[in-house]
A protein has these predicted regions:
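A generic structural micro-feature
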Residues: 1, 40, 55-61, 86-90, ...
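Hydrophobic ligand-binding cavity/cleft-lining segments
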Residues: 1-45, 49-51, 148-149
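Intrinsic-disorder/low-complexity, polar/charged segments enriched in Ser/Thr/Lys/Arg/Asp/Glu/Gln
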Residues: 2-8, 45-47, 60-62, 75, ...
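Hydrophobic/aromatic beta-strand elements that line small-molecule binding cavities or substrate pockets
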Residues: 7-9, 36, 63-69, 92-100
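Hydrophobic pocket/interface hotspot
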Residues: 18, 22, 28, 67, ...
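Glycine-rich portal/gate segments that line the openings of hydrophobic small-molecule binding cavities
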Residues: 39-81, 137
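Beta-strand/loop substructures that line and gate deep hydrophobic ligand-binding cavities in soluble
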Residues: 82-129
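A conserved amphipathic terminal alpha-helix motif
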Residues: 116-149
Length: 149
């Protein structure tokens, strides 16, 4: 089942600080809902464990993420795949772009994911709404952490 999302968030911090935060595993771990571990394997690769509850299904995903098309401090593409045992899998990516906005930064993203297994049987409406909720939670936490507000 395909899930598509896009959006724009204003982060109350300069573009350089936002770029650094987007590449800092500790900051990302603190902001990604359910993230139990996020370890840098190389300059462009991360290993992650994320535990989520989607509807009646609880899953722990182990996966890898790769950063591509890096154009510091303006954009990158993030691609990854996670396996959650019998709960299923998720794989996908996002294009992330930053642009200066006065003393802040506009972060825009376009994300696509493919979800399979038991999770896909929950239906697209639940998966889509949960994805949007998780994205909103990430950006609220990320903005707070990066801006210090």
């Amino acid at each position: 089942m395909a899930v598509n999302m896009d959006g724009e968030e204003r982060i109350d911090a300069p573009i350089g600080k936002v770029w650094e935060a987007l590449n800092d595993p500790e900051i990302l771990k603190a902001c990604i809902p359910g993230c139990e571990s996020l370890d840098k394997k190389s300059e462009r690769e991360l290993a992650a464990t994320v535990a989520l509850k989607i509807g009646p299904i609880k899953a722990r995903f182990n996966g890898e993420v790769e950063l591509k098309n890096l154009k510091p401090p303006h954009s990158y593409t993030i691609e990854g795949e996670g396996k959650g045992g019998i709960a299923g899998f998720a794989k996908g990516g996002a294009d992330v772009a930053l642009k200066e906005d006065g003393d802040g930064t506009i972060l825009s993203y376009t994300a696509k994911a493919d979800v399979g297994g038991k999770m896909a049987q929950l239906g697209s409406r639940l998966i889509q709404s949960t994805s949007k909720k998780l994205a909103a939670q990430f950006f609220a936490d990320f903005n707070k952490k990066v801006s210090g507000n």
